[in-house]
Amino acid sequence: MSESSSSATPLFAWALLGVALLAVSSAGVVLQAMSEVPPLLRASWRMQGTALILLPGFVYQFRAMGSDGVSMRDWQIILASSVFLAIHFGAWVWSLDHTSLVHSLLFVSIHPLVLVLLMPAIGLAVRRGHITGVMVGITGALLSLGDVEAGGEVTVSGDAAAFLGAVTVVGYLLAGRHLRSERRMPIFVYAFPVTFAAGIWLALAAISQEGASMTDVVPEISLIGWTDALWLPWIAYLSLGPGLCGHTGINTVLRWITPITVSITLLFEPVVGGIIGWLWTGEATLGIWTVLGGPLMLTGAIMVTLEEERGDRDRDAVS
């Protein structure tokens, strides 16, 4: 159970959260550096590698719970979740090739704003704090688009693809919330099939859109090219670093740190990712409009997250 008081939180939990934030924030610059590989294939490689890491945990937990523990309805939700994850990850990786790293991370991180638009459809009330947060976030996004220039690194199409990643990750998160919280599904029983299926959808997309194949001897257009000695260290890092240490670390620290604190911490991924990108390449594209709009985008997302936390407390008090 999370402790509400930071004084009761062990120091190593904060250290683990910091490591998890660094891990997930590093994924963007690593994936961007793999530009010799087409984006959809690159995304499929990442899903394949992560699924392989998750497989032992899935086998152990699935055998422990038995096949009767997962209903047909659960499998349908897992399938839908995998489609959302595939579109999210494919769109985001594509955006890394078509806009700046900072813009890609900013636009893919504003999913709390997207969730507000879906709240009426899922039976949740939209309050004034939600609306204010969305307005602040949208203002920031519009300001950030001021850095779009013909032939420049920041593009509307790249930002739009990153935003599509934000839209679709909401479906993935809602499916995960239902299966993990309401159905009490073990983490690996949920994460492995979703990740594995997402890798398949992305592989099919890479075949149809990028000319990838299973038999090609050129690793950069092979569905399993990540097993080549050149690319294996990259995918191993992405799977073990951002994939396992990042996301598993986040789930672990929730035992000691409140979900709202973890959520807000992770909203700083664009800032940390931008710094990592600057350290990696020695340069960063950061126009004046991004400097003005980026903080507003993050502020809006934080406002929505805080408002949703207040709403959860109110609903718990009523029940």
Residue ranges of model-derived segments:
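C-terminal-most transmembrane helix of multi-pass membrane proteins
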Residues: 2-3, 47, 231, 263, ...
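Hydrophobic transmembrane alpha-helices of multi-pass small-molecule transport proteins
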Residues: 54, 58, 126-148, 166-169, ...
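Specific transmembrane alpha-helical segments of multi-pass solute transporters/efflux pumps
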Residues: 23, 59-102, 108, 143, ...
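Glycine-/small-residue-enriched transmembrane alpha-helix faces in small-molecule transporters
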Residues: 1-44, 57, 82-83, 87, ...
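Juxtamembrane helix-loop-helix junctions in multi-pass membrane proteins
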Residues: 21-52, 100-103, 171-198, 217-218, ...
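Helix-helix packing/entry segments at the starts of transmembrane helices
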Residues: 45, 104-110, 175-199, 239-279
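C-terminal transmembrane-helix exit sites in multi-pass transporters
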Residues: 57-58, 111-135, 271-291
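Transmembrane alpha-helices of multi-pass small-molecule transport proteins
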Residues: 36-87, 112-118, 167-175, 191-212, ...
